[in-house]
């Protein structure tokens, strides 16, 4: 045994050095994680400042901006909105993992094409089973398509969070479905939301989507005006991009309706959410109107009861 090995002070120093190395190895990833989420919060606040002109002046009659992009294999819709809800309220109901799954189902079922939403496993599974229909009308579950979304509380920092819902596959040979919500605190009673809805497809999926749109979606439009600056009247985007814009807006209105009714008595909240969602969607009837109010309310009441019992 060497003198160094017999020296208690030397051994103590080596143990301390190894302890510091281990702590550093554990600490550095955490620093990266918090730095990343802090950067995300800074980025989202900067984006809010850049989008202020669009939030102040738009055709939506609310402080929001909608954008979309389509490539050969992916389509994405995004809504940016300033809402009059405290950040803590938004975070507690949409980013709180033990209740987040159930809360997301409560709001997703407001979308007219969503026919069923349940968390089939335990909270640790972080999975949502979602049934969607081709048409905005009542449908039996065997006639719908089931997607399995994984819920992920992706990032969290003071005054900021991001959650992701992701499904590997969908109908019509589509794949990689994503619903992503991030939020940042603006003040004591205001929050800036960024919602993304996206999916991907290959050549077969793209052809299937075009066939679907030609059959079920003829004449339907989105929100983006694609007419030139000298055009006499607006010309709105259609096709796959128009479809994703409509659905992105429907999901955003569901989030807004859910948040708007949290202060109501629990036994009144669902009915109020239905009314709030339908009234909001009718503000954009040219893009979103499919069925009348009573049809929507009756359909969703039936679907909600089914969701609670099956």
Residue ranges of each PLM-predicted region?
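A short, structured loop/turn motif at beta-sheet edges
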Residues: 84, 150-160, 182-192
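Sec/Tat signal peptide C-region and signal peptidase I cleavage site
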Residues: 31-35
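Terminal "cap-and-tail" regions of soluble proteins that handle hydrophobic small molecules
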Residues: 36-59, 64-65, 70, 80, ...
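N-terminal secretory signal peptides that target proteins for export/translocation
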Residues: 1-15
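N-terminal segment of the mature soluble domain
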Residues: 92, 96-121
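Bacterial N-terminal signal peptides
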Residues: 19-30
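Glycine-rich portal/gate segments that line the openings of hydrophobic small-molecule binding cavities
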Residues: 74, 112-174, 178, 200, ...
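Terminal, regulation- and interaction-focused segments at domain boundaries
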Residues: 66-96, 119, 239-243
């Amino acid at each position: 045994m060497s003198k160094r090995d017999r020296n208690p002070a030397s051994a103590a120093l080596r143990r301390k050095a190894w302890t510091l190395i281990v702590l550093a190895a554990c600490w550095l990833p955490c620093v990266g994680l918090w730095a990343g989420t802090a950067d995300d919060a800074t980025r989202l606040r900067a984006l809010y400042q850049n989008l202020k002109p669009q939030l102040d002046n738009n055709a939506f009659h609310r402080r929001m901006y909608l954008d979309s992009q389509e490539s050969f294999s992916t389509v994405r819709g995004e809504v940016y909105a300033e809402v009059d809800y405290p950040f803590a309220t938004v975070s507690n109901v949409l980013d709180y993992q033990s209740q987040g799954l159930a809360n997301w189902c409560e709001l997703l079922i407001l979308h007219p094409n969503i026919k069923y939403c349940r968390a089939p496993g335990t909270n640790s599974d972080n999975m949502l089973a979602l049934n969607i229909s081709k048409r905005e009308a009542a449908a039996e579950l065997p006639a719908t398509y089931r997607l399995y979304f994984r819920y992920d509380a992706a990032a969290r920092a003071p005054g900021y969070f991001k959650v992701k819902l992701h499904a590997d596959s969908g109908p019509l040979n589509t794949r990689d479905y994503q619903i992503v919500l991030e939020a940042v605190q603006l003040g004591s009673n205001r929050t800036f939301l960024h919602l993304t809805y996206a999916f991907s497809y290959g050549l077969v999926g793209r052809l299937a989507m075009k066939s679907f749109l030609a059959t079920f979606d003829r004449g339907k439009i989105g929100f983006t005006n694609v007419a030139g600056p000298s055009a006499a009247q607006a010309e709105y985007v259609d096709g796959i991009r128009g479809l994703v814009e409509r659905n992105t807006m429907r999901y955003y209105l569901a989030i807004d309706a859910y948040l708007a009714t949290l202060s109501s008595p629990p036994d009144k909240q669902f009915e109020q959410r239905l009314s709030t969602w339908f009234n909001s969607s009718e503000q954009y009837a040219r893009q979103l109107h499919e069925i009348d109010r009573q049809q929507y309310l009756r359909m969703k009441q039936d679907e909600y009861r089914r969701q609670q019992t099956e």
